[in-house]
From Swiss-Prot:
Gene Ontology CC entries for this record: tRNA methyltransferase complex
Top-level lineage group: Bacteria
Region (Interaction with RNA): 124-129
Reaction equation(s) it catalyzes: guanosine(46) in tRNA + S-adenosyl-L-methionine = N(7)-methylguanosine(46) in tRNA + S-adenosyl-L-homocysteine
Organism whose genome encodes this protein: Streptococcus pyogenes serotype M1
Function comment: Catalyzes the formation of N(7)-methylguanine at position 46 (m7G46) in tRNA.
Name of protein: tRNA (guanine-N(7)-)-methyltransferase
A Pfam family of this chain: Methyltransf_4
Protein family: Belongs to the class I-like SAM-binding methyltransferase superfamily. TrmB family.
Pathway: tRNA modification; N(7)-methylguanine-tRNA biosynthesis
Binding site for substrate: 122, 154, 191-194
GO molecular function, one term: tRNA (guanine(46)-N7)-methyltransferase activity
Lineage: Bacteria, Bacillati, Bacillota, Bacilli, Lactobacillales
Amino acid sequence: MRVRKRKGAEEHLANNPHYVILNPEDAKGRWHDVFGNDRPIHIEVGSGKGGFITGMALKNPDINYIGIDIQLSVLSYALDKVLASEVPNVKLLRVDGSSLTNYFEDGEVDMMYLNFSDPWPKTKHEKRRLTYKDFLDTYKRILPEHGEIHFKTDNRGLFEYSLASFSQYGMTLRQIWLDLHASNYEGNVMTEYEEKFSNKGQVIYRVEANF
């Protein structure tokens, strides 16, 4: 979902280097040094306005979180949430999800989240979907053996495509929810998008998958 260009967004990010890693390639292989501890590292690709990553960081202070989004204005809103929450265990990156191996060593990330990714519904755009096999190649490299992906969407077509993509890649579909908010699943942290559309009755799909 595109967000209107925000005036001063670039300066906002540049003025907060404690949270926004401006040269993430320099952190490759040393993310524990960046955080100053050896706690697990979880990343969210397509972190949007930061509601999920901030909520997870508040809920799990013993885990380090990295929110990743390519959109400048969106990431600046995520920074607002991080600053307001004063969470010490969050960093933000403005990079593309296809280039993660430039910023993380093999096995350096413990878990990753894909929340409400662009569905790219046209067949000619299949390679842009974040659950396309080329993206899975990248994720597999930066995650440990049997690394885990948690995926949420409100788009039934993307969900079915992603289940098939995970399965064809040889991943294990550990748990599947066809209506997350109607289930007994506890501990769900919502994104801004999820909260908005679930309040309108939109069904939310979720899967946990392992390599």
